[in-house]
């Protein structure tokens, strides 16, 4: 067995162990409050971008209770949980303090870049009718801000759940209340 294979295998095991730990860690109240503060900072930055670009506007979607429950569950699984597992849980170290700062910034920056790039790529592959939206500078700026927020809360909490909650809350609020559903038609 080559040394490279052993290194890759041990790195993969470490990533999976980090993910398992991140999925089973529930932050304490103080950590949730810190993550809430970070989310508040995200909202302060994101709303002006969204309003000025027209990506955010008061336009509640007409949804039945069953549609709310169904779409809420679906949006929890994807994009919130699935994307946070991939782009935070698998790509980022759970214990960021054990990594040299430069390496952590490089890995976090690369994970963020892949996260942002995945949105227009997914649109090209699965929803070509919204490629223009997903490639627009304001949308990519908001995606970057959300990715930064989720990265920060993951690294602070060492848990996947604050970033999943933030991701889910942001997506459902945009789709259900702030015109996102209309923009995706």
For the regions a protein language model found, what residue spans apply to each?
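N-terminal signal-anchor/start-transfer transmembrane helix
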Residues: 2-3
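Interfacial transmembrane-helix boundary/kink motif in multi-pass membrane proteins
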Residues: 6-47, 65-72, 96-110, 136
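Juxtamembrane/disordered regions of integral membrane proteins
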Residues: 7-11, 18, 23-24, 53-62, ...
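Transmembrane helix-loop-helix hairpins at the membrane interface
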Residues: 47-54, 68-185
